Curated annotation (Swiss-Prot):
It comes from the Bacteria. Its EC number is 3.1.-.-. This is Endoribonuclease YbeY. The keyword Cell inner membrane does not apply. Its cofactor is Zn(2+). Binds 1 zinc ion. Belongs to the endoribonuclease YbeY family. The gene is ybeY. SUPFAM superfamilies: Metalloproteases ('zincins'), catalytic domain (SSF55486). Its main location: cytoplasm. Single strand-specific metallo-endoribonuclease involved in late-stage 70S ribosome quality control and in maturation of the 3' terminus of the 16S rRNA.
Length: 161
């Protein structure tokens, strides 16, 4: 676990009208919470998209013909870098705004809390966390709960068991 301040650059882009969407400041806060104690320096991008772009990306990268809530694209270090060189580039998150809004309404969650959860979830994927099996899923979900609790956000998995 690392201590001390995080040097963090979060570039947020909106591929749809910004009305009703979280601010870049909010995304930075949520990413910082996910990284706290885990990494000291990071650059990443968050892109908010419509369903058409979300579906296209999900099809291209995962072979799924629907838009999903969040996609994580970890950065890959360029070949040929000298050993020991560390690059702060963590990767990209793509968040499909209409899917997030629909899920929040269906699940009775505040929109901000759902965006926070998905941003934390996606950021953990960039750090290498996954949920391919029950054990991994349980560990990742517990970490998400802890991070969100630190942000004052209720357990996103409450009532799912």
């Amino acid at each position: 676990m690392t201590k001390g301040p995080i040097r963090l650059d979060v570039a947020v882009s909106y591929a749809l009208p910004r009305a009703g969407l979280p601010s870049a400041v909010s995304f930075r806060k949520w990413v910082a919470a996910a990284l706290k104690g885990r990494i000291r320096e990071a650059d990443l991008a968050v892109r908010l998209v419509d369903e058409k772009e979300g579906c296209s990306l999900n099809h291209h990268y995962r072979g799924k013909d629907y838009a999903t809530n969040v996609l994580s694209f970890p950065a890959e270090l360029p070949e040929g870098l000298p050993k020991g060189i560390k690059m702060p580039l963590l990767g990209d998150l793509v968040i499909c705004a209409p899917v997030v809004a629909r899920e929040a309404a269906e699940q009775g969650k505040s929109l901000a809390a759902h965006y926070a959860h998905l941003t934390v979830h996606g950021t953990l994927h960039l750090l290498g966390w996954d949920h391919d099996d029950d054990k991994e899923a349980d560990a990742m979900e517990q970490l998400e709960r802890e991070i969100l609790a630190d942000l004052g956000i209720d357990d996103p998995y409450a009532g799912e068991q």
